[in-house]
């Protein structure tokens, strides 16, 4: 069978024969009738797996470099772009049947995705969700593997939403997902920016590149888009505004923007404020989650919900019912008053925001337990140490997912930013570090464990090792005394 009999591309896009049974970039997922797209990645080149894919039943191969194979090979200038186009064609271009919302930014993306989905659902809008924690398609709920899935998975999730009768999809969009074309062939009706702070410079090299990668989401707004919702207090706001392809741009913030929070009262477990800019008069709001950063997230959610047709008062009132986000500010306490918090904060800005929030929880010392990913931006490591030392009296450095790096070297690079007067230790075993912090903390102290949130494994030299921070917290609290929920309605630390 010739390539043209199986698939071809014209001005309208790719056309696939009924003989095609699927599209994938992973040779291990190939089944008879599949198209295998050979993608060059950071560690592996898909062209090296063409033989394996053909033996598994691939009927055609798409790639950038010709490879001798007993099946048709279609050469393309960009394998990743072709992968997105082929996946969309295979699943019947599901995004065209949905109102798609994209949420990007360094910190806060997952919370905004979860909370906007909740607000839309409470307003009667049938909404699916793709986040870095979970995917909900209307047909099923499953754990996420990447912040933004590879395009064959993402297109399948959108197809399930369409086929389940959902009308809206809220997608967490990472800078990697944008640059690697994972969101290719998806037109967005609304794009949201939380913030842009230091992250992923191992991949983007400069903050300018990183910011411009985020801005590309706003270029994907469809002509009939509801517009963009951006953090007007963020330094990247003007760049994002300039890249918005369609619709009005609505800014939100505490200091700038069309939608603002005034009369802000940050309380230990919640926040109260008045939302201005969504109607003729200010709307009182209560948010059952701590921290100034969550006020920003809530403003983004309310502004976006109104752009999507939710009545302003209803959108703001729903903020009071927003549920916990897995791995974000999960709180437990010991009977003698030690508070333990598990959070995903993994950037200097995110860590600082989390520490500022927990400072309000109790009067005692703050203990932090964290590490840094191996193979990632090394420049942020001492900055993380400086941020931790600014708030915490005790800093316990440990492993995150070191990958192929030496955990002791990673810890030393973080420790370079920690002044000598701060109690700083390196305990390689993460569960042991958590145990030590919980056992040595005194009543009234706070133990903040960050970097991994709900993740269930650590990676050492390509090997995944089970490790759940919340489980380690429960074990440590059991040694000290039974764990109790910290506050009615708060999420207890458990997996």
Label for each model-derived stretch:
Residues 41-42, 175-176, 198-199, 234-235, ...:
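Short glycine-rich anion-binding loops that position phosphate/pyrophosphate groups of nucleotides
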Residues 41-44, 324-327, 349-420, 430, ...:
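Active-site beta-alpha connecting loops in nucleotide-dependent enzymes
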Residues 63-70, 188-340, 415-425, 488-493:
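Acidic, Mg2+-coordinating active-site environments of NTP-dependent enzymes
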Residues 1-89, 227, 235, 260-263, ...:
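N-terminal leader/targeting and accessory segments in enzymes
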Residues 446-479:
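Glycine/aspartate-rich loop-and-adjacent alpha/beta segment that forms the canonical ThDP
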Residues 55, 59-65, 227-232, 367-371, ...:
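Short internal beta-strands
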Residues 82-232, 238-246, 299, 308, ...:
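Phosphate-binding loop of NTP-binding sites
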Residues 51-52, 56-57, 62, 72, ...:
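P-loop/Walker A phosphate-binding loop and immediately adjacent motor/lid segment at beta-alpha junctions
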